[in-house]
C-alpha cells in the first residue's frame, strides 16, 4: 500500500543557487540548473552523503558527530520571503542573503509542510525529501545588517515558521529554473501525543 500521497499542490522553481564556501560567507550564488546526485549539489558546501552534526541536532549527538546528511538542500518559498520582508519593513529579501539552494512559488505555508514530504519534478522525476523546518539564525541577521544597519535584528522574529525547509536527494537528476515540483505528503494521521511531547 502506498505510504505517500501525491497532492495537487505544485511549486514552481523561481530561483536556484549554491553556497560554495560556507566558512567564507553565508550567501549563495544563483544558478540556472541544480545538479542533484545522491550527495546533493556538488558545488554546495552542504553536499555529501554524511555531515557533521550541528546545533539543530545537539540534543541527539555531540557537536561534530558524523551523521547522515539530511541537510543537502535548503528551500524557501517566494511567499514566505515576501512576508519576512514585509514584517522587517524591507521592500524585498533576496534569497542569496539566506544562503538557500532553491526558492519555490505556489505552495501555501510552505515552511510547515510535513517532514518526509517529497518534492518531485513533474517532468524528470528528480525527488527531494523534506527533512524538517529550517530555523532562523543570527547569521542571516548579520548579512542583512551589513546592507541595512539596525534592521538585521528583525530577521529572526519575522522569519519564524517562514525560513523554509531542509531536504535531501532521494532520486537524483537535475532541477532547472521554471521546473514544477509536485508535493507528496505522508499518508498518515498526526500523532495524537504531539502536543504532549513538545511540551514535556
Can you name each region flagged by the protein language model?
Residues 104-108, 112-171:
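Glycine-rich active-site loops that engage anionic ligands at enzyme catalytic sites
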Residues 113, 174-177, 181-183:
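Short, well-ordered loop/turn sites that connect or cap secondary structure elements
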Residues 124, 133, 180, 186-187:
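Short, surface-exposed secondary-structure boundary micro-motifs
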Residues 1-118, 122, 132, 192-198:
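Electropositive, beta-rich accessory/interaction domains or terminal extensions
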Residues 129, 138-140, 187-200:
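Short, Lys/Arg- and Gly-enriched loop/turn segments at beta-strand edges
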Residues 147, 154-155, 167, 180-185, ...:
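Acidic/glycine-rich phosphate/pyrophosphate-binding loops and surrounding catalytic core
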Amino acid at each position: 500500500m502506498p505510504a505517500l500521497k501525491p497532492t495537487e499542490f505544485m511549486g514552481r522553481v523561481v530561483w536556484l543557487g549554491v553556497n560554495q564556501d560556507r566558512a567564507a560567507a553565508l550567501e549563495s550564488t544563483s544558478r540556472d540548473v541544480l545538479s542533484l546526485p545522491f550527495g546533493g549539489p556538488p558545488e554546495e558546501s552542504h553536499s555529501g552523503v554524511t555531515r557533521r552534526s550541528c546545533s539543530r541536532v545537539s540534543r541527539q549527538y555531540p557537536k561534530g558527530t558524523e551523521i547522515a546528511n539530511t541537510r543537502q538542500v535548503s528551500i524557501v518559498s517566494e511567499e514566505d520571503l515576501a512576508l519576512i520582508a514585509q514584517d522587517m519593513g524591507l521592500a524585498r529579501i533576496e534569497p542569496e542573503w539566506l544562503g538557500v539552494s532553491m526558492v519555490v512559488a505556489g505552495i501555501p505555508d510552505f515552511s510547515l509542510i510535513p517532514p518526509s514530504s517529497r518534492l518531485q519534478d513533474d517532468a524528470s522525476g528528480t525527488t527531494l525529501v523534506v527533512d524538517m523546518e529550517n530555523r532562523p539564525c543570527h547569521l542571516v541577521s548579520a548579512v542583512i545588517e551589513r546592507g541595512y544597519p539596525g534592521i538585521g535584528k528583525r530577521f529572526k522574529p519575522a522569519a519564524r515558521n517562514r525560513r523554509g525547509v531542509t531536504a535531501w536527494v532521494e532520486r537524483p537528476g537535475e532541477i532547472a529554473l521554471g521546473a514544477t515540483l509536485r508535493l507528496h505528503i505522508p499518508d498518515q494521521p498526526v500523532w495524537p501525543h504531539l502536543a504532549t511531547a513538545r511540551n514535556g
